[in-house]
C-alpha cells in the first residue's frame, strides 16, 4: 500500500438526485390552471455526521424540500433517498418515517389532536406502533410529567 487510503463510496443518509417538485393548480373541473415549481433540480448528498442548513426566503421551497425527507410529498421528477430507501416506493414509507422526523416551525401546523393524549399518541401512530402499545406509551408519558 502506498500510504494513500481509498475512500469508500457510501450513499448518504439523505440524497436527492435532480429533485423537482411542482404544485399544480386546477379549476373546479380539474383542468390545470397553473404550475408553480417549488423545488427545481436539487442535488444534495448528506452523509452521517454532516450539519446542513437549508436557507431561503419565504416561499422558496424549504418546507417543500423538507417534506420529501419523510415522504410527505413525492417528487414530480428526480429521486430522494433516506438511509438508502427511495421515498417514491410506498413500501418504504413507514421505515422512512421511523428514520426521519419533522417538527414544523409553526405550532399550529404541529398540533393535530384536540386532546393532550391524542397529541402525545400522534408520533407513535405515524410510525406504525400498534394501538394498544400507543395508549400504554401515552399513559406512561403523561404520568411521567404529572398529567
Residue ranges: model-predicted function:
Residues 33-37, 94:
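Short coil-to-beta microelement around the adenine-binding A-loop and adjacent beta1/P-loop entry
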Residues 130-147:
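Conserved ABC ATPase "signature" region
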Residues 108, 114-125, 135, 139:
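Short helical segment in ABC ATPase nucleotide-binding domains corresponding to the A-loop/adjacent helical element
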Residues 70:
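Helix-to-loop junction immediately C-terminal to a conserved catalytic motif
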Residues 55-57:
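The feature captures the beta-strand-to-loop junction immediately N-terminal to the Walker
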Residues 78-88, 96:
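Conserved ABC transporter NBD signature motif
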Amino acid at each position: 500500500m502506498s500510504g494513500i487510503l481509498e475512500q469508500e463510496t457510501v450513499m448518504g443518509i439523505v440524497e436527492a438526485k435532480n429533485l423537482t417538485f411542482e404544485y399544480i393548480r386546477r379549476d373546479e373541473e380539474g383542468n390545470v390552471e397553473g404550475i408553480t415549481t417549488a423545488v427545481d433540480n436539487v442535488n444534495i448528498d448528506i452523509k452521517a455526521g454532516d450539519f446542513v442548513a437549508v436557507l431561503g426566503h419565504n416561499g422558496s421551497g424549504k418546507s417543500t424540500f423538507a417534506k420529501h425527507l419523510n415522504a410527505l410529498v413525492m417528487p414530480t421528477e428526480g429521486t430522494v433517498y433516506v438511509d438508502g430507501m427511495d421515498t417514491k416506493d410506498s413500501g418504504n414509507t413507514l421505515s422512512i418515517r421511523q428514520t426521519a422526523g419533522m417538527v414544523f416551525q409553526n405550532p399550529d401546523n404541529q398540533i393535530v389532536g384536540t386532546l393532550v393524549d391524542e397529541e402525545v399518541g400522534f408520533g407513535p401512530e405515524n410510525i406504525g406502533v400498534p394501538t394498544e402499545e400507543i395508549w400504554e406509551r401515552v399513559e406512561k408519558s403523561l404520568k411521567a410529567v404529572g398529567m
